[in-house]
Regions:
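An N-cap/entry alpha-helix motif that binds or orients negatively charged groups
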Residues: 1-47, 51, 327-349
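Alpha/beta enzyme core
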Residues: 75-80, 111-116, 121-254, 260-283
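Active-site cofactor/substrate anionic-group-binding motifs, chiefly glycine-
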Residues: 46-93
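Short, solvent-exposed loop/turn segments at secondary-structure boundaries
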Residues: 68-69, 97, 152-156, 286-288
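Shared catalytic-loop signature of beta/alpha-barrel
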Residues: 262-264, 268-315
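A gly/proline- and charged-residue-enriched helix-loop-helix capping module
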Residues: 82-118
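Glycine-centered helix-coil hinge/cap
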Residues: 63, 136, 287-288
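Charged C-terminal helix
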Residues: 304-334
Length: 351
């Protein structure tokens, strides 16, 4: 089986088995919200774009006939729900041009959409520019996936040039750059490092959703690295880390987004936009395109209700909502010196 097809099958198989630390984040109820659903503005500014919704379809797949169909369907979903969408890593098409149409199908189905190309952190400037040209990408994602590469039998073993290449690409390209994790999360030190390279936007993409160490270990004959299935920081911990960074980095979030409530909590934690992948992929494969379009539109309506419930009319006011943390999130913050009391007292009136 093609490696990209294996990834899709394993991601679907493991999807419902993931633990999620969003369950340890509680939003403080506001009995007097003083707003109306009609007043809610879901739009946000992210990666240089104005998005009509605060969530988007994140990088997943491409590089085979099976994944071409998936990308086509995802593009239709994104188009009908007016969502930004990222393709999976286009490295396969850069190595074998015959696979290009498994990615360009996204632009064909969504000609006026905001579409992001995705490449690995070890990619050269020339290849990065090729990736952008492939389907006239509006932005470029560089993914950081060292644990996945190390568990992957055929993966990379040398990451010494990653920082230099990221800096070179940031300087050379003429579209927005997003540096993203692939489900292992980030800490404040990493975000500070990326800021020093000139990066302005990161997707902290934490543990809670698809685990690529788990997926790659399942491809190993002995499956001897199963203990790495939960490697990394959670999405919630990564967002809290990002808020402690010594930079004004723009933060996107992804990893373990199951529903509109998880999106809502990630936005309350400071994300400018939230990426979803595993839930959308699983719903698409189980229920088809039309049902997945309905799910995305349902999330948009649910977000309007959630904003109204706390008295928020836009993302700026949502960032000021009071939150309480428990369990492993609280343990992480105590060990890392992150003050959680300030989050519980962010709303000075009306709570």
């Amino acid at each position: 089986m093609n490696r990209k097809d294996e990834h899709v099958s394993l991601a679907k198989a493991f999807h419902d088995k993931q633990k999620n630390e969003f369950d340890f984040v509680r939003v403080i109820h506001n009995p007097l919200p003083q707003t109306a659903v009609a007043d809610v503005d879901l739009s946000t500014q992210a990666a240089g774009f104005t998005l009509s919704s605060p969530f988007y379809i994140n990088a997943m797949t491409g590089g085979s006939e099976k994944t071409k169909k998936i990308n086509q369907d995802l593009a239709i979903v994104a188009r009908e729900a007016d969502l930004m969408i990222a393709t999976g890593s286009v490295s396969a098409a850069l190595k074998d041009p015959s696979l290009a149409d498994t990615y360009t199908i996204v632009r064909q189905e969504y000609p006026h959409g905001k579409i992001i190309a995705n490449i690995g952190a070890g990619t050269s400037v020339e290849r990065a520019q090729e990736a952008i040209r492939l389907f006239h990408a509006d932005a470029l994602q560089i993914h950081l996936n060292a644990p996945q590469e190390l568990v992957m039998p055929e993966g990379d073993r040398d990451f010494t040039n990653w920082k230099a290449l990221i800096q070179e690409i940031q300087t050379a390209i003429d579209v927005p750059l997003i540096v993203k994790e692939v489900g292992f999360g980030m800490i404040r030190e990493t975000i500070n490092d990326l800021a020093s390279l000139g990066v302005h936007t990161v997707d902290i993409s934490g543990r809670s959703g698809t685990s690529f160490t788990q997926i790659e270990n399942a491809r190993r004959s002995k499956r001897e690295l199963n203990y790495l299935a939960d490697w990394g920081q959670s999405t919630v911990a990564s967002l809290l880390e990002a808020n402690e960074a010594d930079t004004s980095m723009e933060i996107l979030a992804s990893g373990g987004i199951r529903n509109a409530y998880d999106i809502f909590k990630a936005l309350c934690l400071g994300a400018k936009a939230v990426g979803t992948s595993g839930t959308v992929l699983t719903h698409l494969m189980n229920h088809g395109v039309e049902e997945t379009i309905m799910l995305m539109k349902q999330w948009q309506e649910e977000l309007r209700l959630l904003y109204t419930m706390v008295g928020a009319t836009n993302i700026a006011t949502l960032h000021q909502q009071s939150l309480i943390f428990s369990g492993p999130v609280k343990d992480w913050c105590e060990a890392r010196g992150i003050d959680l009391v300030k989050y519980g007292r962010r709303t000075e009136k009306g709570v």
